[in-house]
Design a protein with these regions (language model features):
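Bacterial Sec-dependent N-terminal signal peptides
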Residues: 1-24
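Short S/T/G/P-rich N-terminal loop/turn motif that feeds into the first structured element of a domain
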Residues: 20-245
Length: 245
């Protein structure tokens, strides 16, 4: 937060392509809770967001509680959509002091990531930008161009099938604009109820594997998606995040 964050939960070569056109980007960070002070942190962030990130004079800010995954029990704070040019503006003293008064006593801000949306791999039929409740799948890709291309191809094929079948869900794909050591793809699936996870569904529509194999052939989903991710990534984490209002 002490960094300049009037903007805001990708590989550099891809970024170079996207920067030349309009883009959707969020600045996200993890708020690591101190001493279990959930209520105090939630109220403090709400006060700060209402005053300085209400979407009127600057990009809007959001807070999610992280229910699952390596950061479970903590919070994801995000500002956006924003542009890189927003970062050229220094925060006024009162803005910084408000954060120090309302947020810093209850949490440490870590893991700042600039998430840039990859429109080609995104399936977003209702053209939504922010989901109140989301499942975020993080895919850290192994180093090497062959690994990157293999994972990108698998993610793109899923997007193509979602489009061909007019799926009712959305899947927004983001990249880290400043990867640290390895490239990462983040898949964001909005959901309205936890009941959507019944039947071992984790974001994709019920029966998606069958839909995929009708297009690409029997056994293709395991070969072209599951085996590819197993071989070319360091695993997939699942973060279920619910918005704090």
């Amino acid at each position: 937060m002490i960094k300049r964050i009037l903007g805001i939960l990708i590989p550099l070569m891809t970024c170079a392509t996207l920067f030349a056109q309009d883009y959707v980007m969020f600045q996200t960070s993890i708020l690591k809770l101190r001493a279990g002070q959930n209520h105090s942190l939630q109220q403090g962030v709400k006060k700060h967001n209402d005053k300085y990130h209400n979407g009127k004079d600057s990009p809007k800010a959001y807070l999610w509680y992280i229910n699952t995954g390596p950061n479970s029990g903590n919070y994801s704070w995000a500002v956006g959509p924003t542009k890189f040019s927003d970062m050229d503006q220094s925060l006024p003293d009162d803005h910084v002091k408000d954060w120090e008064r309302n947020v810093s006593p209850y949490a440490d801000e870590t893991e700042v990531v600039y998430m840039m949306r990859d429109e080609e791999m995104t399936y977003n039929p209702k053209n939504e930008t922010v989901g109140e409740n989301v499942l975020m799948k993080r895919i850290p890709i192994k180093n090497g161009q062959a690994h990157v291309e293999a994972v990108e191809n698998a993610v793109q094929k899923i997007a193509d099938v979602l489009k061909k079948t007019n799926a009712k869900i959305a899947r927004r794909v983001y990249r880290d604009a400043f990867p640290d050591g390895h490239q990462e793809i983040m898949l964001v699936y909005p959901f309205s109820s936890w009941s959507e996870f019944e039947g071992n569904v984790r974001g994709l529509p019920e029966g998606f594997q069958n839909s995929y194999e009708k297009i690409h052939g029997n056994g293709s989903f395991r070969k072209e998606v599951m085996d590819v991710l197993s071989t070319h990534s360091d695993g997939v984490t699942h973060e279920v995040m619910t918005m704090v209002k």
